[in-house]
């Protein structure tokens, strides 16, 4: 018999962590259990959390697993770790959910997941990974798109997730935060369509001493460079930085 209380764990693609291969059903620790309640993030235990805090751990993998505990087992041991997690010497892996699926987040929210945990990490994580439908769902449930200095729009721009950028801006994300961070990094990484959309939304191409064109040039993104020039970016900024660092500019200046 196991506990009726439901916990959760996030696993990676192979569901293997620190050399231990997790399997459906009962998993038993092979090494000695670390029962020191003052120790944190140590070997000697299977880690898991509850529904309220699961969003803090989204970057640990791609699957959500339901966890129940074999509390009727006389050899079962468990301690509460720091930072909203527990560890035990035995856990039971139940249902598996994919973290890129909106239904997973609907399930978690319905089971009490805190959408604002760890400075709205859920929407920040979804923006990094380009999960547009998940983002829309999180926003509709009150997620703060401005958390951590508009982290979501900044990282969606860095990673090249156009649909996410478009949706965040439609909901009021600040494209000018941190000296127009979004267009500077979209330019650096060569995300032309995002650069175009940010400019059409009012991004400042001159921010940080024409950083966008300098970074685009330095990384060889000629189409971004050409577009920025067409919008008036200064290729001579910072003592001709763009020209000095990218030979692609020379033909444009002849």
What are these regions (language model features)?
Residues 1-43, 71:
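ADP-ribose/NAD+-binding catalytic cleft of ART/PARP-like enzymes
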């Amino acid at each position: 018999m196991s506990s009726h209380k439901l916990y959760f764990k996030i696993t990676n693609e192979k569901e293997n962590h620190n050399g231990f291969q997790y399997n459906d059903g009962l998993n038993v620790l092979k090494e000695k259990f670390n029962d020191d309640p003052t120790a944190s993030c140590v070997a000697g235990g299977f880690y898991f959390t509850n529904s309220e805090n699961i969003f803090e751990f989204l970057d640990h993998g791609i699957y959500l697993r339901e966890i129940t505990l074999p509390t009727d087992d006389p050899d079962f041991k468990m301690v509460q770790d720091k930072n909203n997690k527990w560890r035990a010497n035995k856990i039971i892996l139940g249902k598996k959910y994919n973290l890129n699926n909106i239904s997973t987040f609907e399930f978690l929210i319905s089971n009490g997941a805190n959408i604002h945990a760890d400075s709205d990490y859920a929407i920040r994580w979804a923006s990094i990974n380009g999960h547009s439908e998940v983002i829309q769902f999180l926003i509709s449930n009150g997620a703060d798109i401005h958390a951590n200095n508009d982290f979501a729009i900044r990282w969606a721009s860095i990673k090249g997730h156009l649909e996410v950028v478009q949706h965040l801006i439609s909901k009021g994300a600040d494209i000018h935060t941190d000296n127009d961070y979004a267009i500077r990094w979209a330019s650096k990484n060569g995300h032309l369509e995002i650069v175009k959309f940010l400019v059409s939304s009012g991004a400042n191409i001159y921010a940080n001493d024409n950083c966008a064109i300098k970074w685009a040039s330095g990384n060889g993104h000629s189409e971004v460079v050409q577009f920025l020039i067409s919008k008036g970016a200064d290729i001579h900024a910072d003592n001709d930085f763009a020209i000095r660092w990218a030979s692609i500019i020379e033909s444009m200046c002849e």
